[in-house]
Every structure is written in structure tokens, then in C-alpha cells.
């Protein structure tokens, strides 16, 4: 029954999306090493992803990726009746990459603005947020660097942006890219738990009941790190994960590691979907089925965009507060 209701809600959301001013479309995408083609001397990854580096990441390849990202976002716009209002991104080298994405492609006509800060990540990659100026504007931004065993980690910062929508409503957006499983899943689990703890401390400091936290958490919804979120945030990917869906494919298995977490008040007015973009999907040559069309297969350039599919959160803002209403009814 729950599944039927979820499907009905999603269809109703989509059918009126283009005309509904109370709707909001949020997107997140890990863009797999989205570097420019210039070696600026900022680290090994910067050198690797340059015209003369081991990846032979040339200007033409960079612009091919920019065009493919723009085409993907516009495909999403066609599918959902509007361009994403907010876009969280991971694995971005610098602000210049985003500036070129927004100004050298068809995205230039959509008036996206950039929120990005450099982090101390050892690979030289950051998270970022794009937003449409016609939909909202920033109130303030903040960063939080995850700590582990009393020390700041050399990983991506957690980005927080408070937005004021056109009608004056405010909403908090958080973008994450938690530590990978490099070194082993069990050995690295503590770092992801620490990153999640940092994210929850940020959420607690906001005094807000309208939080949307998104990102690549490098863990599935049943991992230990998500026990920290259970009392305060609703995981919109949990049901999709239980159905066997995912955003990346490894050794023939789908893993749901990209997801949205929302405040309880936003739970009943939001639906998450994985966007399997047709032209960014290829056949898995080692296993049966399909997989995302990534930029590199090992060291070999193959011309795709990412090993992750983007995810979408559909929000019907006129349904905000339904959670509080029903919670109140249950208490009486």
C-alpha cells in the first residue's frame, strides 16, 4: 500500500509540476573528477588531470564533459517540467570549472549562481551548490570540516547554504561528500561516522525544521553512520535501496550511496528519484545489465560524465507541515 501511495504521489507531483509555483526541484550529482585542463600546481590530482598529465585531460575533453553535464540537466528539465532550482555537486576542482560550465554551455540562459569554497581535501576536490537566481537567493553560507579522533580530516568540507525563496520562505541546504572506503570498508567506517556526526552537529546548530541534506555519503542507508540521523532526519533513499536501486554499480551490484535526508516536516512533501539518463547509460561488459557512462575506465578515457547517476528531490511546498498536523492528531 505504501508503495502504491508513493507512486501516486510522484505522478501527481509530476503532472502539475510545470504549473505549480509551490514546487521545488533539487538535484545532486557526483561529477567524477570534474577538473579543468590546466595544471595550476595545487597537487597531484591537478597535475594528473591536465593536458600533459597521465590522464591527458585536454581542453576538448573538458568542454565535451561540460556540454554533457549541461545536456543532462536540460534533459532533467524536460522530464520534470522545469530546470532544477538547486543543484548540489561533488568532485569539483574549483569555482572556475563551474563558471565555465555555466557560461560556455546552454546553461548560461538559466541564470544559475555558484556557492563554492576550497577545501583541504587531499585529492583537491570540493562540493558546491548551484541555484537559480529566479527562484531564490542566499541568506548566509557556512562550512564545517569533519573531525576524526580530535583532528580535522583532509577531506571535503560540509557546505551549508540558507536560502530565501521568492515568497520569503527560508530553507537550509547541506552538501556532503563523505570519506571513501579507501583502505577497506571496516577500516574507514569510523571516518564516515565522524563526518556524519559533524553533519548532524551542523543541523542541530541551525535551529531549522526545513533542512535538505544531500550528497555522496559513500555508504548505503543501512550503514552504521546513518544511525546518527534516525531521530532527526528522514532518509528519502531508504525505500529505493530496499528495492535494489542504486546510483553507482560495482561488480555487477547497485549501491545507493547518493541520497537526500530531510527534516521530518519535509518528509510527506518530498519524493526522491534516481535519474537514469539514457545517453549516459551503457551496457556493463563484465556483468549483465546497465551502468552509468563514466569519464574514465581505469586510466582509459571513454568519454562519459560520471560513474554516478544524478538524484532528484521533488518537493510540493504546499504540503509542508502535513507531518506536524498528523503528529499532532496522533498525540490526542
Stretches found by the model and what they are:
Residues 16-105, 115-119, 125, 197, ...:
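N-terminal, active-site-proximal structural segment of metallo-dependent hydrolase catalytic domains
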Residues 94-96, 122-124, 181-183, 218-224, ...:
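Active-site environment of divalent metal-dependent phosphoester hydrolases
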Residues 4-15:
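Sec-dependent N-terminal signal peptides
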Residues 52-62, 83-89, 116-117, 147-149, ...:
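Second-shell loop/turn segments in exported
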Residues 19-26, 35, 134-137, 153-179, ...:
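Beta-strand-turn-beta hairpins that frame and shape the catalytic cleft
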Residues 18-19, 201-211, 219-332:
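Metal-dependent phosphoester-hydrolase catalytic domains
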Residues 116, 159-243:
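Extracytoplasmic, non-cytosolic globular domains
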Residues 86, 92-170:
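Structured beta-strand-rich core segments of catalytic domains in phosphoester-bond hydrolases
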Amino acid at each position: 500500500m505504501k508503495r502504491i501511495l508513493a507512486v501516486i504521489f510522484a505522478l501527481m507531483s509530476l503532472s502539475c509540476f510545470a504549473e505549480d509555483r509551490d514546487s521545488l526541484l533539487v538535484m545532486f550529482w557526483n561529477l567524477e573528477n570534474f577538473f579543468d585542463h590546466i595544471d595550476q600546481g595545487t597537487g597531484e590530482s591537478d597535475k594528473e588531470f591536465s593536458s600533459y598529465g597521465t590522464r591527458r585531460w585536454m581542453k576538448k575533453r573538458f568542454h565535451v564533459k561540460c556540454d554533457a553535464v549541461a545536456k543532462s540537466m536540460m534533459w532533467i528539465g524536460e522530464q520534470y517540467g522545469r530546470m532544477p532550482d538547486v543543484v548540489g555537486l561533488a568532485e569539483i576542482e574549483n569555482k572556475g570549472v563551474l563558471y565555465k560550465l555555466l557560461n560556455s554551455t546552454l546553461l548560461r540562459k538559466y541564470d544559475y549562481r555558484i556557492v563554492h569554497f576550497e577545501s583541504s581535501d587531499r585529492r583537491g576536490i570540493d562540493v558546491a551548490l548551484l541555484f537559480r537566481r529566479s527562484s531564490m537567493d542566499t541568506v548566509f553560507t557556512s562550512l564545517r570540516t569533519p573531525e576524526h579522533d580530535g583532528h580535522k580530516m583532509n577531506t571535503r568540507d560540509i557546505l551549508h547554504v540558507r536560502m530565501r525563496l521568492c515568497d520569503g520562505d527560508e530553507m537550509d541546504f547541506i552538501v556532503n561528500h563523505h570519506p571513501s572506503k579507501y583502505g577497506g570498508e571496516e577500516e574507514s567506517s569510523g571516518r564516515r561516522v565522524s563526518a556524519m556526526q559533524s553533519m548532524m552537529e551542523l543541523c542541530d546548530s541551525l535551529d531549522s525544521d526545513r533542512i535538505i541534506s544531500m550528497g555522496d555519503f559513500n555508504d548505503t542507508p543501512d550503514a552504521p553512520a546513518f544511525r546518527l540521523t534516525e531521530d532527526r532526519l528522514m532518509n528519502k533513499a531508504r525505500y529505493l535501496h530496499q528495492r535494489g536501486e542504486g546510483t553507482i554499480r560495482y561488480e555487477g551490484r547497485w549501491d545507493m550511496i547518493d541520497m537526500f535526508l530531510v527534516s521530518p516536516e519535509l518528509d510527506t512533501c518530498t519524493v526522491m528519484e534516481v535519474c537514469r539518463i539514457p545517453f549516459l547509460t551503457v551496457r556493463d561488459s563484465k556483468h549483465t545489465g546497465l551502468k552509468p557512462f563514466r569519464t574514465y575506465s581505469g586510466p582509459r578515457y571513454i568519454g562519459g560524465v560520471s560513474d554516478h547517476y544524478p538524484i532528484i528531490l521533488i518537493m510540493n511546498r504546499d504540503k509542508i507541515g502535513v507531518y506536524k498536523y498528523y503528529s499532532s492528531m496522533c498525540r490526542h
